[in-house]
Amino acid sequence: KKAKSFGINAIEYVSGLYTNHTDTLEKMSMSKLGKELLKRSQDYGVDNVLIMIDSQGSLASSNNKERLEAIDNHKRWIDFSYKLGCETMRVNLSGEDNLEKWTENSVKSLSVLSNYNKDLNVVVENHGGLSSNGKYLANVMSKVNIDNCGTLPDFGNFCIDGSPRLCAKWYDIYKGVKELMPYAHAVSAKSYHFDDNGHE
């Protein structure tokens, strides 16, 4: 209702709105919640396009038990996303600092999730750590090579040392966007400051 009142016809969700308020999930199952939210959005002519999943386990972890638990957690959200009518679900690739292991673990997890429901896009955002390196994340995508698995390039999230607000080292944002766009199913377009030549 609020989105429609602002003239917004498509919205995205974030899992933390529900996992951080467990009373919501205690009152109704994820399945019922998804159906209820879909009904509300349809009543106002608003499309549910994407949901961002956070804090559901480390999909790139080298601890196999931990990684498999993360996959199971994300499968629940795939079911939820599909019932909600979303086209796309965003995940994070965290849990490993070694590039070779991170790549291998990420490919395994994404392959399972992407094949779990071929009608839903599973995308990775450059969201800290090794995933904020465009070259590394693009390499993961090329190895997964599944149509409904891709990226969500975030123009302001290419910090490879620190956090965006206190970043010690940035990956080249233009290079990163160029590397990730061939695999993109959605984008998080951000712009802040430009120099006299029009560069961010």
Language-model regions, residue ranges each:
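Boundary/entry segment of secreted carbohydrate-active catalytic domains
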Residues: 1-2
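Structural motif corresponding to the early beta-alpha repeats
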Residues: 6-108, 121, 157
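Acidic/histidine-rich catalytic cores of soluble enzymes
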Residues: 10-11, 107-200
